[in-house]
């Protein structure tokens, strides 16, 4: 498989130690996040978030990752068994162009989203804990590729 996501640790100095271990093993196994997600029983975004240290891996996730990536389960458990330190992995504003575009979407549409959500649901917030997200690829009739990012959060 080609075009697999990899990790340049010099670009991500705040990621947990487990990130390097997981990304190196992912590259050696030549696996996509979709393939890894199927093995551990999660969606691919949640799986990638585990690799970046932004989601909590369950004991079962750690065992399945160790098995698939041929890593010592005890080493993974030591590095991933605690609680994630979310939100520290990226400088703000982000410099990476795709991450910046996502940031820009929130800058441009954040208050519009808030207004519509408040009108539909009343006062409150959308959870980022009771949350799921998915990425799909769509190709239109002209052959242009479109990214579809779905976010689902408890109100």
UniProtKB/Swiss-Prot annotation:
It comes from the Eukaryota. It holds the Pfam family Cyanate_lyase. Keywords: Lyase. The active site is at 101, 104, 127. Its EC number is 4.2.1.104. Catalyzes the reaction of cyanate with bicarbonate to produce ammonia and carbon dioxide. Belongs to the cyanase family. This is Cyanate hydratase. The gene is CYN1.
């Amino acid at each position: 498989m080609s075009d697999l996501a990899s990790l340049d640790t010099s670009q991500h100095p705040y990621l947990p130690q487990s990130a390097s271990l997981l990304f190196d093993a992912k590259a050696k196994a030549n696996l996509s996040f979709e393939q890894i997600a199927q093995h551990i029983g999660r969606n691919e975004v949640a799986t990638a978030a585990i690799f970046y240290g932004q989601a909590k891996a369950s004991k079962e996730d750690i065992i399945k990752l160790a098995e698939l990536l041929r890593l010592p389960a005890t080493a993974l458990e030591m590095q991933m068994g605690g609680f994630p330190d979310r939100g520290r992995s990226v400088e703000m504003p982000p410099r990476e162009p795709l991450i910046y575009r996502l940031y820009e979407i929130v800058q441009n549409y954040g208050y519009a989203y808030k207004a519509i959500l408040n009108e539909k649901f009343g006062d409150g917030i959308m959870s980022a804990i009771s949350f799921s997200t998915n990425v799909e690829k769509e190709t239109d009739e002209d052959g242009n590729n479109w990214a579809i990012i779905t976010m689902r959060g408890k109100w």
